[in-house]
Amino acid sequence: MIWNWLRKKKKSNTSKLNETDNQEQHSNNQEDDNKEQTRSMKHNKGKNNEQKDSSQDKQQSAKQGDSSQDKQQNPKQEDSSQDKQQNPKQGDSSQDKQQSAKQKDPSQDKQQNPKQEDSSQDKQQSAKQGDSSQDKQQSAKQGDSSQDKQQNAKQDEPSQSKQQSSGGNSIYDFTKPEKDRIHSLQNLIEKLKKSSDFVNYHTSDDETMPYWISYYRPSLDGEKLQKYLMPTLLERPNASLEELKEHIPMSGITITNDLQKIEDMVLKGHAIIQLNQQDQKCMLANIAIDNYRAPTPPLNESTVIGPQEGFVEDIDTNINLVRKRLPVLDLQTKEMIIGEFSKTKVVMMYLDNLAEKDNVDFLEESLRALEYDQINDSAYLQELMGEKSIFPLYINTERTDRVTKALIDGKIAIFVDGSPSVLLTPVSYFDFFISPEDYNVSWMYATFSRILRLIAVLFSICATPLYVAVLNYHYELIPSDLLETLILSRAQVPFPPLIEALFLELAIDLLREAGARLPMKVGQTLGIVGGIVIGQASVQAGLTSNILLIIVALSALASFITPIYKMGNAVRLLRFPFLAFAEIGGLFGISLGFIFLFTHLFRLTSLRKPYALFYPTRQQSVKDSWIRFPLTMIDTRDVQARPQHVKKAAKGISTKHRSDFDD
């Protein structure tokens, strides 16, 4: 029926065309509409050619108008319907004009006057009757340009839709689809019941009685449930949730209808208690297991003298250990959750009257901006916060006394739930060579120990490269007596010094890794026996010289002298690029390597503070850096952290002659 109506409509329009032949001048004024209609002409090129040949006869054009327009209407309507389906969002003005020219719906025909209908028909005929070649070429070019524009618009459409769908969210889009979203407490419980270790049951066989309990069975502390929670529920069957909260002898009980809070708490070991199964309001009781490892001596930072108290995996226990040592009101904490899946609890701790405000704000902003699936240890935060150097920019410690000392100096501590290590920032290069034991011995021995550590690090980096450089380029620097011994030791070695040094260095690293992965007693035995056997056998086999074996062994021992384990890893790793520099340029190559090393150290920053304290020089920090002054003379805090108050209390008893005691 619609097709018949369109045909009748077209017939009435063609009858009016015979009366308004003089209005063909409107076609020149409406070139834009003609350009837009060329797209349909290009698709129906064969049909248009026939229509152009027949249009030369004015009398036949009136008779054949119905058939030609009816034939043309089908592809036009099909094209317009396809364009609408493909481009539902491209409602620009040019396409509106095309659709209005292609589809003359009844509503538009009723609103437009006969003159407008006549002019539209004239426009169509003028587009169809373009006999000149110039008009044909222009229409073809314009049709191509219009198609290109439409294709570009179609190509831009998916990118715009992607941007709109992302909505400016992070790269980790965990938005749940509408069907998976939780709209009620019952939906949440049904989703939790998909896990086999989730329990949901009624406390009574009578369905009319109250109290439904839901929890995860592995996280259940049976003593809390049977001794504190269940007796109160059974004794008060008609009590409300508020009354139960007052009578249950447990702490941390909350009443809420917040679905997100309920989900977070039940995943942490809380139990859901409902009066009725259809209630949206519930009570949350903490029945999780609280048995954690007790504080033990730190394994990676052992000392002979001083406290032997180390952190554990429970973050609340670690914070309590620090608060026990610093019972002051200014000790503040800021808590946040990091990890898209792990939901790891991270806490910043600092002294509000000492820590610089800019440091606190910048670190908090950096931590909250982190996005990662799982945070298992504090070392994850070190790398995620931009640690790209082989040198650690955060001190990773297990000792409570080191953390309290850093907090008093104005630094910030970062606790991670599940990790026994605490991060300290900002720090300098010399902080990694300071041991907590230095404050428990005399200042002279502490100074000697710190200088010895720095010399040991320098020896560990340079000893083997110097051996390679001297044998390759500077053998004239070796004394004649030592040169003869060195020549005899290398007489049977078939390899160059570089290959010989790499063989022993890699052998030492293999023994170290194997000893660390094996059980403690087996690892110690393997390190001692393996080192002796492999070293003696390699010398007898002529694979290496005994002098280089001694140098490599001393270098390995020197790398273990650093109090912080990660700094020792950096020192051991530096030996290999220095070996390459020594092989290429001798002593000049080693000097070039140190230039690169110091340039890198000068560029490093820890929490936007200079990492290498020897440049720029800070005289106030020298008292407790690579040397240690007596405690009474260390009257200023470490300026590396820019504390609010630099001066600190440092007053002792004078040892001068006092007449009242001596007499």
Curated annotation (Swiss-Prot):
The keyword Phosphoprotein does not apply. Residues 1-175 are annotated as: Disordered. It comes from Bacillus cereus. This is Spore germination protein GerIA. It is found in: Cell membrane. It comes from the Bacteria. GO terms for cellular component: plasma membrane. The gene is gerIA. The keyword Membrane applies. Keywords: Cell membrane, Germination, Membrane, Transmembrane, Transmembrane helix.
